[in-house]
Design a protein with these regions (language model features):
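Short acidic, Gly/Ser-rich segments with clustered Asp/Glu that frequently serve as metal-coordination loops
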Residues: 41-45
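Small-residue-enriched hydrophobic alpha-helices in membranes
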Residues: 1-38, 48-154
């Protein structure tokens, strides 16, 4: 599994300037992508708009090309199949992201959840659960939700 990940990152993700941070950054990209995919699947109805929003979020957040983002998402889907829960991904986020970056992940999850203009109870539960797992305070969880609703004019 580690070998497949190393092949993936060497082929599709630009290396960072500091060698020791490479794996960390790549793992964070994978963890974030996996959570976004899980959010897209949370309401059991995956729309084209949700797929586009996930792709756009990954491209923007990590400054990746469409090809790199597509490869990252494909690899993340494979990792999700092997995962037993969110902990595998949230533990990486806890280790590698600042508090502000964690709040941004929650905001990204809300963006995916609201893409179809409807918030399913399973989507809200997932965002709440991830926020708890990455230690985002309730006020920041709510503020992220309100920012996204305002941005999307809901």
């Amino acid at each position: 599994m580690v070998t497949a990940f190393n092949k993936f990152v060497k082929k599709y993700i630009k290396p960072s300037a500091v060698g020791s941070d490479e794996v960390s950054e790549r793992s964070l990209q994978l963890a974030t992508a996996a959570l976004l995919i899980e959010m897209m699947r949370a309401d059991a109805e995956i729309t084209g708009d949700e797929r586009r929003m996930v792709m756009s979020t990954i491209m923007t957040r990590f400054h990746l090309t469409e090809e790199e983002s597509g490869a990252l998402l494909q690899f993340a889907e494979e990792k999700i199949r092997d995962a037993t829960g969110y902990y595998e991904f949230t533990s990486l986020i806890n280790k590698g992201f600042t508090y502000e970056q964690k709040v941004r992940v929650i905001e990204n999850l809300w963006e995916i959840a609201f893409t179809d203009k409807y918030l399913d109870k399973h989507e809200e539960h997932m965002v709440r659960r991830v926020a708890d797992l990455i230690y985002v305070e309730h006020k920041d969880f709510i503020n992220a939700k309100l920012r996204v609703k305002k941005k999307l004019i809901l």
